[in-house]
Curated annotation (Swiss-Prot):
Gene field: lepA
Name of the protein: Elongation factor 4
PROSITE patterns for this protein: G_TR_1, G_TR_2
Catalytic activity: GTP + H2O = GDP + phosphate + H(+)
Pfam family, one: LepA_C
Enzyme Commission designation: 3.6.5.n1
Organism: Rhodospirillum rubrum (strain ATCC 11170 / ATH 1.1.1 / DSM 467 / LMG 4362 / NCIMB 8255 / S1)
Length: 601
């Protein structure tokens, strides 16, 4: 079939909770992709974690067949369900590169949110034809006309032919399918040209080995053919090709314009670089397709097993997750306080939480997580440049020329009654206002903020100030020089490397006092006095003392000479002095996490 006019490849883009996965469910149901008895909510969110949190983490693909009412032809629709959260923007960019058009789903009661904007701009950059869809028009609070105007004002899309639907009840789903067929362009490609297929995603299946998700641009991928990975130069014979309906369905071949999966008995996903081009080993394509820009981990934290004998299990588990999620990185590290573990890099905080939860769930591990930090650039006096992932490793200030930290461009959309508090929060976090515009009763503020300031609990604070109405999206902009210092935390005069952090000099004293105060409440009392100190270099900037537990050694003295009591008390004093010298202070796991939260709410 060299005619590609019957194929439509499209993605669904939306903010979290605007009904993207529900719409995908309805499209699958309407096109008969799944029998009624197999139908379940969020059909494409295959991970338990995705279903529980109601978010999409991995992009999924489905092939559907739809007979158009307008011309009676049967069309092949390839749907990519994409994540909506800012941390998974990388997954979104890959999905968009594999499609020619998108459905933009906007909640008719809530309107355009910050992440809708980010994903729409990505789709426009990818050259997509975009169909606006207003979801949840059956809600009493829905205001379709106002939201249409907002889409035109904020994004600049024509909404005169936007489709109003209710994904929950299935209202007007057929109109969405008609719009897909009539308004989206078919893919371009030549079946007879040398094979070129874009590797969109890959994951590891314990029975099948590595499953590769591809979008064929030119030529054909057939069973039995030898495929060549252009980036790595590896050659593998293809065992199976097929499509998802959403179940796996084997076919003989995948030709230009189609999406599907390929299996070739590959054991390691390291051989499958996402964004690579697959071609026929016997008649390779002259050049590779443009890939994706590599995702760069933004947030780093240490993961340590509670039981040190689990170290190897943790290593294997991380390697397995890396198979499915090429966007996170890890390297071994050791800590005096926590033993051996790994320093892991993530795309953002939600990504970090998800990976940690998957490790605990899928591999049964008990983990200690250190505070998240960002990557600082250390410019040394001898002209070298160091990238610092762990605050505990910060070099001696004498050897430092200057330090740079990453800044982000953050877009915040918020109802205007909460704007004042939101702007105050951004200023408190060293933000620089770049833009402030209004669309109806919502304001859109654009700020430059240091990533270090938002990485911890900025999102939580934003939500609590705005009663959950604000939405937030950011992209890493660039590095800028800052006056940063390392604050060490000493417990019983011993530095605890896992609690060290880097802060701006103006905030170091305040943060140090805050953390010492918290640790005083979090560390249980011992039989001797425990001093907790925060220090910059050799200068102590804050101190708290945990009082000793008192054991009443004179309880068994009834009356008699006072010197008898004094002797016992002196003996106890000597013992406590010795204990203070050699005693070990136990710091509970909860102290590591709670001590480093920025705010007290």
């Amino acid at each position: 079939m060299s005619d590609l006019s019957h194929i439509r490849n499209f993605a669904i883009i939306a903010h979290i909770d605007h009904g993207k996965s529900t719409l995908a469910d309805r499209l699958i149901q309407t096109c008969g992709g799944v029998e009624a008895r197999d139908m379940k909510e969020q059909l494409l969110d295959s991970m338990d974690l995705e279903r529980e949190r109601g978010i999409t983490i991995k992009a999924q693909t489905v092939r559907l067949h739809y007979t158009a009412k307008s011309d009676g032809r049967t069309y092949q629709l390839n749907l990519m369900d994409t994540p909506g959260h800012v941390d998974f923007a990388y997954e979104v960019s890959r999905s968009l590169a594999a499609c020619e058009g998108s459905l933009l789903v906007v909640d008719a009661s809530q309107g355009v949110e910050a992440q809708t904007l980010a994903n729409v701009y990505q789709a426009i950059d990818a050259g997509h034809e975009i169909i606006p869809v207003l979801n949840k028009i059956d809600l009493p609070a829905a205001e379709p006309e106002r939201i249409k105007q907002q889409i035109e004002d904020v994004i600049g899309l024509d909404t005169s032919d936007a489709v109003g639907i209710s994904a929950k009840t299935g209202l007007n789903i057929d109109q969405v399918l008609e719009a897909l067929v009539l308004r989206l362009p078919p893919p371009t490609g030549d079946v007879d040209a040398p094979t070129q297929a874009l590797l969109v995603d890959s994951w590891y299946d314990s029975y099948l080995g590595v499953v590769i998700l591809v979008r064929v641009r030119h030529g054909v991928l057939r069973k039995g053919m030898k495929m060549l990975m252009m980036a790595t130069g590896a050659v593998h014979p293809i065992d199976k090709v097929g499509v998802f309906t959403p179940k796996m369905l084997e076919t003989d071949s995948l030709s230009a314009g189609e999406m599907g999966f390929v299996m070739a008995g590959i054991k390691s996903v390291a051989d499958c670089q996402i964004g690579d081009t697959i071609t026929d080993d016997r008649a390779p394509a002259a050049e590779a397709l443009p890939g994706f820009k590599a995702s760069i981990p933004v947030v780093w934290c240490g993961l340590f097993p509670v039981d040190s004998s689990d170290f190897e299990v943790l290593r294997e588990s991380l390697a397995k997750l890396r198979l499915n999620d090429s966007s996170f990185e890890f390297q071994a590290e050791s800590s005096a306080a926590l033993g051996f573990g790994f320093r892991c890099g993530f795309l953002g905080l939600l990504h970090m939480e998800i990976i940690q939860e998957r490790l605990e769930r899928e591999f049964g591990l008990d983990l200690i997580t250190t505070a998240p930090s960002v990557v600082y650039r250390m410019h040394m006096t001898d002209g070298t440049l160091l990238e610092l992932h762990n605050p505990a490793d910060m070099p001696d200030p004498v050897r430092l020329d200057f330090v740079e930290e990453p800044w982000v461009k953050a877009t915040i959309m918020v109802p205007d009654e909460y704007l004042g508090q939101i702007l105050a929060l951004c200023t408190e976090r060293r933000g620089i206002q770049m833009d402030l515009t209004y669309a109806g009763s919502r304001a859109m503020a654009v700020y430059k903020l240091p990533l270090n300031e938002i990485v911890f609990d900025f999102y939580d604070r934003l939500k609590s100030i705005s009663r959950g109405y604000a939405s937030f999206d950011y992209e890493v902009a660039d590095y800028a020089e800052s006056d940063l210092v390392k604050v060490s935390i000493l417990v019983n005069n011993e530095p605890v490397d896992a609690l060290a952090f880097i802060a701006h000099r103006t905030q170091a004293d305040f943060r140090g006092r805050q953390i010492c105060g918290r640790l005083k409440d979090l560390i249980p009392r011992h039989l001797f006095k425990v001093p907790i100190q925060a220090a910059i270099g050799g200068r102590v900037i804050a101190r708290e003392t945990i009082a000793a537990m008192r054991k009443d050694v004179t309880a068994k003295c009834y009356g008699g000479d006072i010197t008898r009591k004094k002797k016992l008390l002196e003996k106890q004093k000597e013992g406590k002095k010795k204990m203070r010298q050699f005693g070990k202070v136990e710091i509970p796991q909860s102290a590591f996490i709670n001590a480093l939260r920025m705010s007290d709410d």
